[in-house]
Structure formats: C-alpha cells, structure tokens
C-alpha cells in the first residue's frame, strides 16, 4: 500500500474551540508541524491552513480545514485534487468517543461512526477508503451529553493522556509515510 502524502487534522476553527476534545485532530497535526519546525500558512483555495514537513525522507502535506467540522470534506478533497493525492495516501486525524483518553488507533476504510468531519469527507469522495487516526477522548456516558462533551475541554488528567496518545501516534508516522501500516498499527496498538 502507498504511504501517506497528506495528513489532515479535523477540528473547528476559532480560539473558542482551540483546546476542546473535538479538536484532537488539529492538536495532532499541530504537534507534527511543531516537531518538524514547520510553519502554517493560510491557503484560501484549499479552505484551510497548510504546512509542509519531511517525514522519513518524504514530503508530507499537513492540513487544518478552516471550515467547521461538518464541512471538512470540502477542504480535504480540494487538497487532494490540488496536490494530486489519492484518498489511499491520505490520513484524517480525529477525535474518537469510543476510545479512552490515552488511546490512539490507526484504521483504513469504513464508515463515519457519527464523526461529522469523516461523514462529510465520505459524502464528497463517495467512499471511505482513506486512513484514519482515531484519538481517544472518552465518552460522557450518555448520548444526550455528547455535544457538550466534544465541544468541552478535557480535564488536566485527560489532556495529558490525549497528548501522550498524540505523541505515540507521531512516533509511528514514519512507518505510515513509508506505507508500512501493519507495523505502524502493531506499534501503536500494542500496550506499553
């Protein structure tokens, strides 16, 4: 399988959303850019901010859609068209209610699982054949509390766990960029 050429962090723009659970995808690509010493640039034709990084000797584009979460597909598909990147060479990093804070999982293909950024991207692509990095944020316990939960800020303890999961995911990105997803998954999914 081809390696990654585009890594998208899903989230909501604006300072009021900056440290919310729903912006775990933004936090992931921001940490990748920081580690690489890359700078973010506004790119209106791609409806977001972009950064160019080197991972495992390969050029990889990072993208933070400036659309709100439920319109993320517009930015994702614009970037894929502009840079001529296939969906299979794309990873979308997003918050995951079904995983505990401190857990991150890689996945290829599938549905949206109620995640609106994935839903919009799948709608525009016509399929879900792209990679996902699911960053655990935990579940509030009842579906009626989900909106407030994802749009809220995590506790200090959960914030540390989420940051640790992001660091663990960054550690396996060289393997994913080289196309060795099975080894990347094995390392990320094996408890330490």
From Swiss-Prot:
SUPFAM superfamilies: Peptidyl-tRNA hydrolase-like (SSF53178). Pfam families: Pept_tRNA_hydro. The record marks 95 as: Stabilizes the basic form of H active site to accept a proton. The keyword Aminoacyl-tRNA synthetase does not apply. It is found in: Cytoplasm. It is an enzyme of class 3 (hydrolase). The record marks 12 as: Discriminates between blocked and unblocked aminoacyl-tRNA. Its EC number is 3.1.1.29. GO terms for cellular component: cytoplasm. The keyword Nuclease does not apply. The active site is at 22 (proton acceptor). Coiled coil: none annotated. TRNA binds at residues 17, 68, 70, 116. Hydrolyzes ribosome-free peptidyl-tRNAs (with 1 or more amino acids incorporated), which drop off the ribosome during protein synthesis, or as a result of ribosome stalling. Catalyzes the release of premature peptidyl moieties from peptidyl-tRNA molecules trapped in stalled 50S ribosomal subunits, and thus maintains levels of free tRNAs and 50S ribosomes. Belongs to the PTH family. Monomer. This is Peptidyl-tRNA hydrolase. It comes from Stenotrophomonas maltophilia (strain K279a). The lineage of its organism: Bacteria, Pseudomonadati, Pseudomonadota, Gammaproteobacteria, Lysobacterales.
